[in-house]
Amino acid sequence: MKHLLTLALCFSSINAVAVTVPHKAVGTGIPEGSLQFLSLRASAPIGSAISRNNWAVTCDSAQSGNECNKAIDGNKDTFWHTFYGANGDPKPPHTYTIDMKTTQNVNGLSMLPRQDGNQNGWIGRHEVYLSSDGTNWGSPVASGSWFADSTTKYSNFETRPARYVRLVAITEANGQPWTSIAEINVFQASSYTAPQPGLGRWGPTIDLPIVPAAAAIEPTSGRVLMWSSYRNDAFGGSPGGITLTSSWDPSTGIVSDRTVTVTKHDMFCPGISMDGNGQIVVTGGNDAKKTSLYDSSSDSWIPGPDMQVARGYQSSATMSDGRVFTIGGSWSGGVFEKNGEVYSPSSKTWTSLPNAKVNPMLTADKQGLYRSDNHAWLFGWKKGSVFQAGPSTAMNWYYTSGSGDVKSAGKRQSNRGVAPDAMCGNAVMYDAVKGKILTFGGSPDYQDSDATTNAHIITLGEPGTSPNTVFASNGLYFARTFHTSVVLPDGSTFITGGQRRGIPFEDSTPVFTPEIYVPEQDTFYKQNPNSIVRVYHSISLLLPDGRVFNGGGGLCGDCTTNHFDAQIFTPNYLYNSNGNLATRPKITRTSTQSVKVGGRITISTDSSISKASLIRYGTATHTVNTDQRRIPLTLTNNGGNSYSFQVPSDSGVALPGYWMLFVMNSAGVPSVASTIRVTQ
């Protein structure tokens, strides 16, 4: 099967044109680990390169022979270079400004570094701006850091009409004072539709040096920690023992990177959970028995104990006592029935649970066990139990004492009948006090399978009892698989990305329009669409400021579907009726930053509030985020702007670890979160 991908190619004239070339499908029906990779490719903006005829370009500095126009001459062997000489070179930031002479619907930029084997001037941190008049530039439409190599770099962003484009080089990849560009192109969308009011907004884009296939929020800093594999663009053929990571700091906008070797663990396709002490436990994947621990307070990676069973594509979940349960994972480490095991943070050991059988939770995937035990929807619950909500039709209770056990919880069904398997769908606990879980999307088989619009509400009771399951609204607006989702402070669930037919490493049949499920109304609402494909290997996380971080996709080496970026979605609750950012309530004081389950917290705010919630810090990979869950809080008004609330007394509801505390005013506008650690 062949698909068409639009690429911008530079010819020998000054004019760059867009041509369409066939692209061989990658990954279709082929296990990931068997692929061989050649060179990095990145996903270009959806659209075409704009003709560079009649452009006028200016730059802040240029070396004689390397003038500004050398970056638009269609010759990859020439390049613009800032001035260098014996008397001190001008330091960054350096700017390159394009006047296209006419207004275009701009949605991206490509930058080819110099191709002569010299790294001088390679751009690291950067920002991209648009303007209609060349004077008013506003805030960046994209910013971040590019990987330091000679491949073409892209900044993809939401379409905006503009005549002027400016690239600002903030740093040089090797810390030198120069900037150089061999070729620069600007991309246009076929049309422009302004975002509709009341449906949230996308942007800006964060350019990354890696494809973020896995991520977590660092609870003590609020930074987004991301990683790919042993390479920034590929996972196949790994030598093991190495992982490329990046982090983005929302407070500064700075993207940094780190190569992790201390844990001797390629952490691609892992299980991820934040344990009861707040350490992020990363298990298996390319190095299928390994465990790596990330400690946010010290910003350090720590080697953990090997698992009893080698695993990849397994899920894991933190339990009521702070331990971590994992099961399945036949993508790597051998294909056989991989029963449960438990990690103890106190003893730093894994213990097998031979009677916590994986067989009851298997799907009927046409690729067999290699796929059927992947990405379980796991929820730590009361009394050390773990509820498995899917993706199989069968639901189960897992028990973690002694040798473990498993008991059927029935099937995921409603008055519309028994739901099929929903591999690579999502499950979100949006009200942990009431045991409410929203499940949606997915497909019967992992790949080459049509997605579903099915959505269900599962209500948990005591461990071992059959949960109540009903159909949610009329289901999703859009069938999707390989999508992602987060629970929001107000209890709604934001759903984005995915494909109508699941094909790994293909950007075909993408879903661009997100949805929000509002449980009080039992209704899904469409939101403003984005323009960057987010499918296989994409991630989403809730930020402490109430926005959504959504990025990644690809990691397939010699392909054109690698997405080295993320976007921010700002939900409508952060805007007022005029479409401007609303004034937020602020938490000015908390009586404690650490509380035992059942304990009370008193807070002070700068204004009146009406609601509050706790949301556990999230981790995400391969459609799975078992850490996030929401607790709606009952507030007591102590007078003035002082309020108190009680944390639920059951640690199966209020799992130990780090939580985000949000307060909301009568208009539903949330605060920036304060971090609360819940202990046993």
Curated annotation (Swiss-Prot):
Protein name in the entry: Galactose oxidase
Cellular component annotations (GO), alphabetically ordered: extracellular region
Cofactor note: Binds 1 Cu(2+) ion per subunit.
Record field: catalytic activity: D-galactose + O2 = D-galacto-hexodialdose + H2O2
Cross-link (3'-(S-cysteinyl)-tyrosine (Cys-Tyr)): C269-Y313
PTM section of the record: Galactose oxidase contains a protein-derived free radical cofactor. In the active state, Tyr-313, which is cross-linked to Cys-269 via a thioether bond, is oxidized to a radical and acts with Cu(2+) as a two-electron acceptor in the oxidation reaction. The cross-link is believed to modulate the redox potential of the tyrosyl radical, which is further stabilized by a stacking interaction with Trp-331 in the active site. The post-translational formation of the cross-link is closely linked to the propeptide cleavage event, and both are copper-dependent, autocatalytic processes.
Keyword flag Transmembrane: no
Entry GO MF terms: galactose oxidase activity; metal ion binding
Activity regulation comment: Inhibited by diethyldithiocarbamate.
Positions of Kelch repeats: 223-268, 279-321, 323-372, 436-490, 492-544
Subunit details: Monomer.
Species lineage: Eukaryota, Fungi, Dikarya, Ascomycota, Pezizomycotina
